[in-house]
Amino acid sequence: MVSLTSVPPYADATPDTRASSGPAPGRRKRMPLREHLAELRTRLLLVAGGLVVGAVVGWLLYDPLLVLLTRPLHLAAATQHKDIALNFTALGSPLDTRIKVSLFLAVMVTCPWWLYQVWAFVTPGLTRREKRHAYGFLGAAVPLFLGGAGLSWWVLPHAVDIFASFVPAGSSQYVNAQEYLSFVMRLVLAFGVAFVAPVLLVALNLAGIVRHETLARGWRWAVLLAFVFAAVMTPTPDALTMVLVAAPICALYFGALGVAVWHDRRADRRTAPAAA
């Protein structure tokens, strides 16, 4: 006699995958809050370590860097035959200036390092598409910021020369070291941020916050603001310098507008069949 087993006929046909199922494609498994905080602490320590190393390098290179920073003052003094020099007004001002220059150089030099740490902390929670966008933003923002900083260095001697021209003949000008270095740092940051602003507009467009129609309607205001920014940052009597500063900013704005037009039209074509 053949004995029949009591095993259901379809017991092995559909295995239970609930316990072994992983995260959905393109997503990462959720990390507990404690692990997030531990990862954040690690990244912050790495950023702080990089800034300390950069500050030490800035401290050691302070003397040649100060010569480079004060070169526009010496050029203005030589061309206008005036007595123009850097002045330290307080007893601790030389030390404060050295610390400020060292920290500023540390932030600039270690920019790739701390940006990578931010990226390493954020990227595990991003989807594949978001990672591609982030790669594009970083790949565009860093060179644009450095380009803006380089343009500010070209503008700086012209600005110093214009300000020095207002010194009366036979007078001397002793420029406060703290104020002068703060002016240089603000100039570098202002140009860097101005060049990165179009990347932020593209990010807002990709996020669905701003459409290309809005950017197209505001192009006149964008051009006006670019020329106002150039006029304020380059107080020179000739219009050529102002145009040379404003033209790249305008070109970047229209480049961002072109990317927004391409993205919106592509998104509209993708959603049109679903709406129909």
Swiss-Prot record:
The keyword Membrane applies. Its main location: membrane. It is a multi-pass membrane protein. It is found in: Cell membrane. The keyword Magnesium does not apply. GO terms for molecular function: proton motive force dependent protein transmembrane transporter activity. Residues 1-29 are annotated as: Disordered. One of its GO terms (biological process) is protein transport by the Tat complex. GO terms for cellular component: TAT protein transport complex. InterPro entries: TatC (IPR002033). Keywords: Cell membrane, Membrane, Protein transport, Translocation, Transmembrane, Transmembrane helix, Transport. The chain crosses the membrane at residues 49-69, 103-123, 136-156, 187-207, 221-241, 242-262. Pfam families: TatC (PF00902). Part of the twin-arginine translocation (Tat) system that transports large folded proteins containing a characteristic twin-arginine motif in their signal peptide across membranes. Together with TatB, TatC is part of a receptor directly interacting with Tat signal peptides. The Tat system comprises two distinct complexes: a TatABC complex, containing multiple copies of TatA, TatB and TatC subunits, and a separate TatA complex, containing only TatA subunits. Substrates initially bind to the TatABC complex, which probably triggers association of the separate TatA complex to form the active translocon. Belongs to the TatC family. HAMAP family: TatC. This is Sec-independent protein translocase protein TatC.
